[in-house]
Amino acid sequence: MSWDDAIEGVDRDTPGGRMPRAWNVAARLRAANDDISHAHVADGVPTYAELHCLSDFSFLRGASSAEQLFARAQHCGYSALAITDECSLAGIVRGLEASRVTGVRLIVGSEFTLIDGTRFVLLVENAHGYPQVCGLVTTARRAASKGAYRLGRADVEAQFRDVAPGVFALWLPGVQPQAEQGAWLQQVFGERAFLAVELHREQDDGARLQVLQALAQQLGMTAVASGDVHMAQRRERIVQDTLTAIRHTLPLAECGAHLFRNGERHLRTRRALGNIYPDALLQAAVALAQRCTFDISKISYTYPRELVPEGHTPTSYLRQLTEAGIRKRWPGGITAKVREDIEKELALIALKKYEAFFLTVQDVVRFAREQNILCQGRGSSANSAVCYALGITAVNPDETRLLMARFLSEKRDEPPDIDVDFEHERREEVLQYVYRKYGRERAALAATVICYRGKSAVRDVAKAFGLPPDQIALLANCYGWGNGETPMEQRIEEAGFDLANPLINKILLVTEHLRDHPRHLSQHVGGFVISDEPLSLLVPVENAAMADRTIIQWDKDDLETMKLLKVDCLALGMLTCIRKTLDLVRGHRGRDYSIATLPGEDLPTYKMIQRADTVGVFQIESRAQMAMLPRLKPAEFYDLVIEVAIVRPGPIQGDMVHPYLRRRQGREDVSYPSPAVEDILKPTLGVPLFQEQVMELLMHAADYTESEADNLRRSMAAWRRGGDMEQHRTRVRERMQGKGYASTFIDQIFEQIKGFGSYGFPQSHAASFAKLVYASCWLKRHEPAAFACGLLNAQPMGFYSASQIVQDARRGSPERERVEVLPVDVVHSDWDNTLVGGRPWRSAADPGEQPAIRLGMRQVAGLSDVVAQRIVAARTQRAFADIGDLCLRAALDEKARLALAEAGALQGMVGNRNAARWAMAGVEARRPLLPGSPEERPVAFEAPHAGEEILADYRSVGLSLRQHPMALLRPQMRQRRILGLRDLQGRPHGSGVHVAGLVTQRQRPATAKGTIFVTLEDEHGMINVIVWSHLALRRRRALLESRLLAVRGRWERVDGVEHLIAGDLHDLSDLLGDMQLPSRDFH
């Protein structure tokens, strides 16, 4: 086998393996076909339809994708192919897509094994049978934990009792057929029960054929040929064997009877089948396949209608709510342009019959607002004037240029996408509201298909092949360190593996085949599917891993193909942070704000942003965004919209970023490729940055319709992978050149479309996010204590650890006040971090004094909120007399006592950590002293030295309010001639420097071609270090494993952006001893 042999139809360019799937099936099929040994289909060979075939959605059983299976079936001349995954219809939509391209008819089915061992396949005959199979799968899956199923004969009998006939049952007799099983199946399904004869070129095939034919005659069942197919081609047996070993958690050498005896469970040529099966069995299979006429693409779906009150239609009620929203959003009346947009959109919604969908989203948002849960719509829905009127989105149509086609189009044969973000800590309340509103029969989350990636695949494969754990780890690290500049073979050899070793070669080949191979189903981050009828009539429903949640077996791409609407209820940590911050500002500072009422266009806020003083704020907190801020210098809200969108693959790949910056800085004249597109490009100085701009350019400059422009944008990534991109480039070029546009501009536009096909922001989405960017920045600038406190209380979220947040708040900046932070103390601390002291805000002229932050007990490692609440409740009743009183009234167990002592949280009661440890150790088994015994005097304990205290702080609280660790190490740094970060400020551009700091962050952007960005911190601040890919590979261990990293390199200062270009790296972590420091890596 070669490397190419191992990858049949695997789309390695697709992020997530399947995105976007609906437009690249043909490409994946071509890839599968390219590697198929073309079977000669001669006259005279029998016709055939395969009735029992597992795809890769029979997890860890099926070795081939639907694309590979249908491509093979097409080449072998099959008339039909049944996808019969085990107790699942999760892969059936992929089968539908592959069927459409190949012309091989899809038969819908599923395989089942009952708890008594009876095995059979159900094949859907017609529209009556499909919901019956869905219902049986649902029953089985809901009766077991996630990933399993449980089904008994009584369940099957109940499902098919007194229903219209619509399925065929195919009995799978097994190695030792038990006639009683077949008789039972025949009792349930009558003449619709068949016996599957499955022969795989084994020694006893002849005898088995006779036994099964006799058994069929005895039971009065028709026998049909069937393949028990687990792979498209014979050579995939090694993959199937490996999956079997993984499934059974055994090395291949110990799998024994778990493995098939040969590779015959593939889609065999019709000539080969004719040499194995009697013609009658092959003809019976074809005849049965012909009776299965069900077309899954024809299933009907109705959105819930109970939100429409009596006397209204969905259309009239949506109109009523929209008009009410207009009066609220625009109390002074709306412009003619907005009215025109709303009327046009309402008409299109009615035409597409999406009213109930909009009403459902509006209802969910209404519930959240009634519960004081912050929420905001985003994505392309922010192009909707109706969504704004309904209160779903926050982008005012008067303030931005909307392009409705980006959200909703008459020609687009797919539902609109409305994403709504909710506070991440309270999103579950919203999900449970949906479940209560519609019931678990009619509401469920969409699935997400978890696929193997290189690292996870090689771990499982190497383990199956018996590689020792240490070698598995080495091999896996090669995959975790991928970049396009160093071939995989080289990385593996550098790790010490011999590619000529047959064992290593096999491991690598199977690993490549398993890349993007489905591993299991998980739940979508928040995509709800809601139906007017039970969902199990449309798609099987199963239990999720989390309690009180259920998921359907289709993912978001399946839903799009099947035209099922989903409501995305997503979780956003920054909304939690902002809500908690606003509550603190209201309660402690006397300022009652919402996101909408925060003072707009605040100059001090923009000054802070321009300095990249944005640790912890929304979106513009990453190192890449921070590097952009001093160059772009946002000075108004629209600049924030651009800032959010500009550091994305679309503008970057289209080479639009630097021209825009040069024009913004006055280094390049603002010009337009044509007066006809000046209005489109004027907001971005003649440079297209947003998806909507590119679409409008295509419409004006290349005579595309709205739908054509959007289809091109959405489909470009799939076309590129399929190799058909040039014809579309040619079409755009010819049309634009015909209107006088320069070739360089045309190429830029096309490259940007390609980038957007991978990942890019529409302007509407960027504007939605910019609202939160501004809100978080305003709060950080004007209420730094409340913001830092709210951010700590919203953890985990964002790029920065609690330690970095606290360091940033205490450090302050020229634009922002410093904040005092007080330690955790059981005498004063609540569970949450709180504000203490300060003076309330009175006016702009009298802003008061910033309060201090008292760290809460949530920061203490190993302490639960339940214990903390007991401490607070007991303290509220009366002050603690001593440690014994605390432990008694708060019912502290040994774990809680130790956690509080280690965290230094008893400072206010007994003093330093050593004293606290001793005091807590003496709490157990205290007995009354004997009469006359002298009282035991407290023992004075010397405080731990500074290094021990800091070490204990990080270990128990994750941060320290004492000296920064680097301050303690500064004398040793000076001996090594290592500079502090503060020393860099006076260094000219291009200077050679040697610095060191704690590693707080590592990032590897997808567009950076292997470059790693590292953030270092010392007692004076942070810097960004750029590590080129060649150095990253050479100093890999120091880069990935260092807690304290020394860097020699070149200091660069350009346009207010400062960073260090690494020339060499050294790990100095041994100087920290056992100190473990938090680092947010590769988020």
Swiss-Prot record:
NCBIfam families: polc (TIGR00594), PRK05672.1 (NF004225). This is Error-prone DNA polymerase. Belongs to the DNA polymerase type-C family. DnaE2 subfamily. It comes from Xanthomonas oryzae pv. oryzae (strain PXO99A). It comes from the Bacteria. Keywords: Cytoplasm, DNA damage, DNA repair, DNA replication, DNA-directed DNA polymerase, Nucleotidyltransferase, Transferase. Gene3D superfamilies: 1.10.150.870, Metal-dependent hydrolases. One of its GO terms (biological process) is DNA repair. DNA polymerase involved in damage-induced mutagenesis and translesion synthesis (TLS). It is not the major replicative DNA polymerase.
